[in-house]
Amino acid sequence: MTRRFVWASLVVSIVAGPLVIAPDAQSQTTGNAATPRTPDGKPDLSGMWGGGDGGRPVNEDDRGNVTDIFPSRRCGPTQVECGDYTNQSVDQEFTGRMDRSRPLYRPEHWDRVIYLDMNTNREDPIFKCQPQGIPRQGPPLKIVQTASEVIFFYGGGEDYRIIPIDGRTHNPVRARDVTYFGHAVGHWDGDTLVVDAVGFNDLTWLARGGYFHSDRLRVVERLRREGNVLHYQATVEDLEVLVEPWALTPRQLRLNTNLDAFIPEGEPCHDYDSQNMVTQIRH
């Protein structure tokens, strides 16, 4: 099992490391808050985001800090008390398979999906200290918005994306330089920020379950703020392996208004769960 700090999702992504931030007690008042806007009239997406409907699961330590836990059969060397949350068979692995939104692969690719799924502990790229990529990474933990760009920060601080929103289109040279997070540009569709990303490598999965993709992957993310609630939805297109675009389950996240909230520094990635990988016990 690798240690990598990521933003959690019950449906889309696998959490591979602990994330600790300040408690977000004030974020409960979301429905009646006014939507802040930038000087040009666009919704201001800036802030720390988490929890809410379809957001990350909330666990708290004895000091009230919100923590995300390794989905492993055993605790990591520096892990917070695991409790039952580490048993992937009864939480994320199970609930992830209950989601009705799943990618539909072309017939010739299903054998590979099944093989990767059955051999997850050996084949899943996140166990090799690789980034989760998009859309598996899920929504950002923190957004910083300016007039010309948005910056998405994810758990642990290692992964971030700088996305222009000044109307430019994809740079054809950079779009061919395949990466884990692709080449993204954004534009406003009314009050919704639309982020269009291409230029991915084929080294990540769309989600747990062996859901691989090709380097023809395209991901469109939509973010809309209503008061202190951020609505997030991603759609995947991959003409090489998918029959049709896959619309992931929408998520709602709440604004964390605690001024002490922070993103902890990431740590080196290690393999420590080799016994389970060898015995093929599912993560």
Residue ranges and their predicted role:
Residues 2-11, 17-283:
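PEST-like low-complexity, intrinsically disordered acidic/proline/serine-rich tracts
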